[in-house]
Design a protein with these regions (language model features):
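Extracellular, repeat-based ectodomains that mediate carbohydrate processing or recognition
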Residues: 1-219
Length: 219
């Protein structure tokens, strides 16, 4: 509760599939977001090969009383290679969006890319399906972070090792509207610096300012 007291004392196994016991492999990197009505969603990386090939991104919804709303479900549509580093954000209208890193070079065409999938308030996937977030495909795109924006959309940030414009690692972001459409193209958040193995910008985080401006901060 707001005072820090435990309201529901028993821990739960998020990644267990009903009727089949514990999943094989590891379930790691859990992230969660609160949803409308007091419920929440947990997303994580599954290493058992349930998505057909290597690591996959799965999620599970819960109501306000910690009751699971169905079994865990697969988020990524592309099952080739590794999907990892999930992040999740609550959206206006009761839905949510999951972002992650994929090293399926056949989709991004160059190393790792950042992908997004949006879900509606009832937990059903939005019609746009799996979306490639990054515009540039130079090098790899890693460690996505995501935040809701004041206009009902959301912002995804990540870092790239593509050495663009003479820089080494750089942080970029992409804005989306409430329907999952891109608003413009990706934007560099970090200041370009000469290529130097000892200078890099990575591990981004996003915060929406607690005012009516709609401004946000990326670190």
């Amino acid at each position: 509760n707001p005072d820090g007291a435990v309201m529901y004392g028993a821990e739960q196994v998020v990644s267990r599939v009903a009727g089949s016991g514990n999943q094989a492999g590891d379930q790691a990197n859990p992230v969660m977001a609160m949803l409308d009505g007091g419920g929440y969603v947990v997303a994580y990386t599954d290493t058992s090969g349930l998505d057909g090939n290597g690591y996959g991104i799965f999620a599970r919804r819960y109501d306000a009383n910690d009751n699971p709303l169905g079994d865990p479900f697969q988020v990524n549509l592309t099952g080739l290679h590794t999907q990892d580093e999930p992040a999740v954000v609550r959206l206006s209208g009761g839905g949510f969006a999951v972002v992650w890193t994929s090293n399926d070079y056949l989709v991004d065409n160059s190393g790792d890319g950042v992908f997004m999938r949006r879900y509606l308030a009832d937990g059903s996937p939005a019609p746009e399906g799996e979306v490639l977030v990054n515009t540039s495909i130079s090098g790899n795109q890693y460690q996505p972070a995501v935040s809701q924006s004041q206009d009902g959309g959301f912002i995804v940030a990540w870092y790239s090792d593509g050495e663009r414009d003479g820089s080494y690692y750089d942080v970029f972001f992409q804005r989306f509207d409430a329907s999952g459409n891109k608003l413009g193209i990706e934007t560099r958040a970090s200041t370009p610096v000469p290529v130097n193995p000892y200078i890099a910008e990575y591990e981004p985080a996003i915060a929406l300012l607690n005012d009516s401006s709609g401004d946000f901060v990326i670190t």
